[in-house]
Amino acid sequence: MKSRIFFITLLTIVAAQESADQLCSSFDAQQSCGQCIKAHAECAWCIDPHSSLTNRCQLKSKFTNETCTPHLVYSPQTAQVKIQQNLPLETKQHDGKTIVRQQPQAVSVRLMPSHSATVSFKYLHQTDPSRRSTEPETMEIQTSDVKDTPLQLKFFIVCDGELKETKSCRVQNNQIVEFKIEVLVNSCSSTGDITLSVGILRQRTIAGLYVTTICGCECEKHPEINSRLCHQNGHLVCGQCVCDQSRGGDKCECPLASHGVSKASELEDKCRFNSSSPVCSASGKCKCGQCQCNKPTVTGKFCQCDNDSCPLAVNGKVCSGNGVCDCGVCKCEMGWERDDCSCSTASNNCVDNGTPAPEEKDKPESVPEEPEATEKPDDMPSDSDLEKELDESSSAKEEQTSSSGVVSRVCVLLTFFLLVLNF
C-alpha cells in the first residue's frame, strides 16, 4: 500500500512540475517580469540584460550559469514576514505611561496570491482594577474589516494549553496569551498595501499588520529610460527592452516600417510557423522578422528542422552513414534504402537492424551446364510475383520486429511498476 501511495505521489509531483513549466513558458508570462512571477510560484525571471535567452521566464530550476547570471535570476519569496516594532510586554510605550500589553506592535507581510503566512502575537490580559471577581474572562481577537480586500484570515489561540482555531478564549487576570493569525492572499490588491489593526475586544491594546501583495517585480519600479542597450529607442525594464512604438526586436534595433509592419508583435509573428507556434520553433531567435537558429544542425525558415534527429543505426551512425539527415528524415545515397539507410539494394535481402545477410562461402568454380530451353509452366510464378513475395516477406519481418519491440517496452514498464510496488 505504501508503495502505491509513493508511486501516485511521484506521478502527482511530475504532473505538477509539467503544469508549472507550461505556465512559465506561456505567452503571457514572457511579456514582463511581473506577469512571470504571477504565473506560478516556481517561475523566475532573468533580469540579466546581456542574456541570450529567448524566454526570460522559466522554471527557476531550469536556469543555468550559461543562460543567466545566477544572482540576476529574480524569484521573490512567496511569503515574507518582518517585525517592524517589538517592545517587550509590561514595558512602557514611548509616551512613558502606557504599558505594553501586546507584542509585537507592528508587522509587515509580503505575500504572493494563493499563498499564506502566519503571524504570532502575545497578549497580557489585565482586568479592570475595580473588578473584584476572580473568575476567568473572555478575551476575543478583533481586527479591521477585510470584506472588501483580497485577504482571508484565520485565528488560533493557545487556549487551555492547546492551540485551537478560534477567536476567543477564557483567560485569567495577568495571564499571557499566545495567539496567531494566518493571512491568505486570494488575489492582487487593486488599492495597494492593506493596513489592518489587530487588538482585543474592549481592551486598550492594538498592533498594526501591513500586508503587501507581491504582484510585480521591484526592478519594474526603476526602468532605465532610453537605454543604450535598447539603441536609445526604448526603456530597459528588468533586463528586457520595452521599445518605442515604431521599433521592434530584442534590443529595439528593428524599425517596423522598414519591415512592412506597424506593431512589434507583427514583426515577431513573422518568426512563427503559425499563430500558436513558438517563436522560431523554440530553437532560435527572431531578428527583425527572420529566425536565427541556435545550432548549425537546426535549419528551416522557422528553425523547424533538426538535422540531428534522424535514427541511429546499430553502427552508431546517423542514417547508417549511407545518407544525410534532412529535417529529421534520412535521404539515402544511391543503392541504400529504409528509414535509416541500412539496407543495401544490391543484396536484395536485408535482415533486421540493417545488417546485410551473410554471403555464402566461396565455392569451387564450376562451369554450369547450359540448361535446355524449355517452356515455363503456366503455374510457375513470374519474376514480378517473386519480387512481390520478397517484399511481403520483408514487410512481415519488419512488423514482427516492431511488435517484439512493443512487447519488450511493455515488459520493461511492468517490471518497473512491480519494483515500485515492492519498494
Curated annotation (Swiss-Prot):
Residues 354-406 are annotated as: Disordered. Residues 380-392 have a biased composition (Acidic residues). Glycans are attached at N65, N274, N307. InterPro entries: I-EGF_1, Integrin_bsu, Integrin_dom_sf. It holds the Pfam family I-EGF_1. Residues 1-16 form the signal peptide. Keywords: Disulfide bond, EGF-like domain, Glycoprotein, Integrin, Membrane, Repeat, Signal, Transmembrane, Transmembrane helix. The keyword tRNA processing does not apply. Residues 422-423 are cytoplasmic. GO terms for cellular component: plasma membrane. Residues 215-350 are annotated as: Cysteine-rich tandem repeats. The chain crosses the membrane at residues 403-421. Residues 219-253, 254-304, 305-342 form the I-EGF domain. Residues 17-402 are extracellular. It is found in: Membrane. The keyword Repressor does not apply. Disulfide bonds join C24-C217, C33-C43, C36-C68, C46-C57, C219-C238, C230-C241, C243-C252, C254-C288, C271-C286, C280-C291, C293-C303, C305-C327, C310-C325, C319-C330, C332-C341, C343-C350. GO terms for biological process: integrin-mediated signaling pathway. Belongs to the integrin beta chain family. This is Uncharacterized integrin beta-like protein C05D9.3. It comes from Caenorhabditis elegans.
